[in-house]
Amino acid sequence: GGYAEFTLADERYCFSLPDNYADAEAAPLLCAGLIGYRALVAAGEAKRIGIYGFGAAAHIVAQVARWQGREIYAFTKPGDADGQNFARELGAVWAGDSSAAPPQELDAAILFAPVGALIPQALRHSARGGTVVCAGIHMSDVPQFPYSILWGERSLRSIANLTRSDGEAFLDIAPKAGVKTEVETFPLTSANEALERLRAGTLRGAAVLMIG
């Protein structure tokens, strides 16, 4: 992160970006994509994956998961028909409100939406042995839930950081998987507008702030 035009960094902690992405298209790969990929790895070999919150990270992860032959079930905030249609365009086999039940039990779920109340819902929709991965930095409080929805060797975990090997693997996979980032650019002076659009859930894909 950061908006300096020039910086000095240890090359051991830098990644080479794929050549076939313009700067704005590559920008979402470096946060949303990297953390999203680590969350996907944390989901293990799950075949049916639920994604709660279909924004910047989700629209990238969905493409990688589909390339890997997995099924994506997308959950958006209630009434977000545009977000659900976007998920279907990217290959989701089902898309619906976060309050809805998917047509099949999930092997894993990834939560990008910072809503603690979604954790019990994701657990209820997960098969025995399933994993629920919380990929956000912040989340509202998780409500009390019965042990029975965690029982059955279901697991609940969070994602906080990524490793260099995660980054190298993802940036190698992204062009092979044909990942296309959908971005809306804003000048840096319109950062507050971009944040408001993000909060309102009216962005399709990712917002990218341009310095120049």
Predicted regions and their residues:
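Short strand-turn motif at the edge of the Rossmann-like AdoMet-binding core
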Residues: 135-139, 159-162, 186
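C-terminal hydrophobic helical "lid"/dimerization subdomain
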Residues: 120, 164-212
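Structural detector of well-ordered beta-strand residues that form the stable sheet scaffold
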Residues: 15, 50, 73, 131-133, ...
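Glycine-rich cofactor phosphate-binding loops and adjacent beta1-alpha1 units
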Residues: 43, 73, 81-155
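Mid-domain Rossmann-like dinucleotide-binding core that forms the NAD(H)/NADP(H) cofactor-binding site
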Residues: 19-99, 103
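Short beta-strand/turn micro-motifs composed of small residues
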Residues: 53, 76, 113, 136, ...
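Terminal helix/beta-alpha structural elements that buttress the NAD(P)+-binding lobe
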Residues: 48, 60, 70-71, 83, ...
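Glycine-rich phosphate/adenylate-binding loop and adjacent beta-alpha elements
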Residues: 1-14
